[in-house]
């Protein structure tokens, strides 16, 4: 599901006027995706970054990197390497405790906001916590894990797939007042067209689609979760 050897040719995704994304290992089923986002003050934040040769060229034209952020307990990825490269700490929201033990770099804690994004905690399971980030000024939503867009995680015509373990009790409260123009994801290409409708469809039909998800996506999602803790 996830390839652990050194990355080769990365793939650029999710480019818009205030950010860009990349997949360091685009051929893997898990489609781990990283992002560089420009903050309102002009500084650039790297979110859940995964390294690849020359990947700095992807975000070089956005501005100077002022921080590295990790927004999920299983997304330590290459945050420490990027923090050292850009001489910045790794910023982690409160409530994410597992990941700090796996980051070999200075860690700074935040609570409610980061780079103009409001932060909201989502915890589908006791051992699974992540932080959803939404920036109202440009209606950008970032979801690390609980939503994804890859074919391995979606059901039918869904453009956003909700993790099968969250379908019985979907985290609607965390997304209740969010109306995104774009949804960036920690796994898969972002959703840029009719993003709000795609989000509403996924959350509103999560339980109804659970039986299909148990057959079509659950085996792959289980492999992904097992692989993530290695």
Regions of interest found by a model, annotated:
Residues 46-49, 66-73, 91-94, 142-145, ...:
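Active-site neighborhood of phospho(di)ester-bond hydrolases with catalytic His/Asp-centered motifs
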Residues 50-93:
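Active-site metal-binding motif and surrounding structural segment of the metallo-beta-lactamase
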Residues 2-10, 14, 21-22, 27, 81-84, 88-129, 136-138, 163, ...:
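Metallo-beta-lactamase
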Residues 63, 115, 178:
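Structured loop/turn residues at beta-strand edges in well-structured enzyme cores
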Residues 31, 53-54, 73-78, 97-100, ...:
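Active-site environment of divalent metal-dependent phosphoester hydrolases
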Residues 27-29, 50-53, 72-75, 125-127, ...:
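Short beta->alpha connector loops
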Residues 23-67:
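Pre-active-site segment of Zn-dependent metallo-hydrolases
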């Amino acid at each position: 599901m996830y390839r652990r050897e050194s990355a080769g040719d990365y793939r650029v995704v999710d480019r818009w006027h205030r950010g860009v994304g990349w997949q360091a290992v685009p051929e893997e089923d898990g489609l781990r995706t990283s992002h560089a986002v420009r903050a309102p003050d002009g500084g650039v934040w790297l979110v859940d970054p995964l390294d690849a040769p020359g990947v700095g060229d992807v975000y070089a034209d956005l501005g100077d990197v002022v921080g590295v952020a990790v927004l999920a307990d299983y997304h330590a990825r290459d945050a420490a390497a990027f923090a050292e490269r850009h001489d910045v700490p790794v910023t982690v929201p409160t409530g994410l405790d597992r990941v700090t033990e796996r980051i070999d770099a200075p860690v700074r804690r935040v609570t409610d906001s980061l780079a103009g994004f409001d932060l909201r905690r989502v915890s589908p399971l006791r051992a699974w916590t992540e932080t959803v980030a939404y920036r109202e000024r440009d209606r950008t939503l970032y979801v690390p894990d609980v939503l994804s867009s890859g074919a391995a995680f979606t059901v039918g015509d869904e453009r956003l797939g909700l993790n099968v373990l969250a379908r019985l009790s979907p985290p609607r409260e965390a997304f209740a007042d969010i109306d995104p123009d774009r949804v960036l994801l920690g796994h898969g290409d972002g959703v840029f067209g009719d993003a709000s409708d795609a989000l509403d469809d996924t959350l509103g039909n999560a339980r109804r689609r659970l039986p299909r998800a148990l057959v079509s996506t659950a085996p792959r999602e289980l492999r992904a979760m097992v692989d993530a803790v290695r």
